Structure formats: structure tokens, C-alpha cells
Amino acid sequence: MGRAILPTTYSRADAIFNISRTPLVIEALRSGDLDLLRKVMDDKIHQPYRLELISAGVKAYQVAKEFGAVALSGAGPSLICFVEPEKAIAAMTSIMAAIEEQGFVARGLITKPSMLGTHTI
């Protein structure tokens, strides 16, 4: 369903908007620059469409934006929020509350980035 809602074509401006941010996202993740990440995580290719599929998504997205850089992740109804470690619990709790206030069950997970790259666990 996540991919089915996407348009079959996009404007040149929207494609350029997304593509031009790719190196900045990589640099923000590499350097840990959360201010830069907050600025470059907006998207015009799939977020506006997929957010509609997540019943509590718009509210959760708004709450998450208060804590850090947010983007829809994958083809399913998941949100990812990059925040400073000291804000992680508050961000997760607030996002889950926003989802649960709309009558849905929410599950949160706090992780840390791995510098190992792809590997077998």
C-alpha cells in the first residue's frame, strides 16, 4: 500500500529538491550534525503521500519535529526521529502518546548508530 499511493511521475523541481539533499543527509549522518539533519530531512517524493496512510501520522510527525529530524522510513507506517541522546526518552514518549491519543497502539525503540556497517549478527 505504501508504494501504491505514490505518483507515477514527479515534477522536476520535486526531484531536484530530493536529490540535492542526498549528500547533505550523508554528511549530517557522518558528522553527527543534527542541526543540518533537521534541515535536510524534508522530502517531496514520498513523505507527503505516505504520511496520509498513517492514521496518527500527521500528529506524530508534528510532535517528532519538535524533538529533531524526522522522516518516514520504508514502505510501512514507521517514523524515525534523530535526536540528541538526552532527548530520546522524552521524544519517544511524546510521539507514542500522540499516536495513542488517536486510538492506536504505538511501539518505540531507542537505538544508537553502528559504525560496523553491514555485518552478520
List the predicted regions and their residue ranges.
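Anionic-ligand binding region
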Residues: 1-28
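Glycine-rich, charge-dense phosphate/pyrophosphate-binding loop(s)
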Residues: 18-19, 29-121
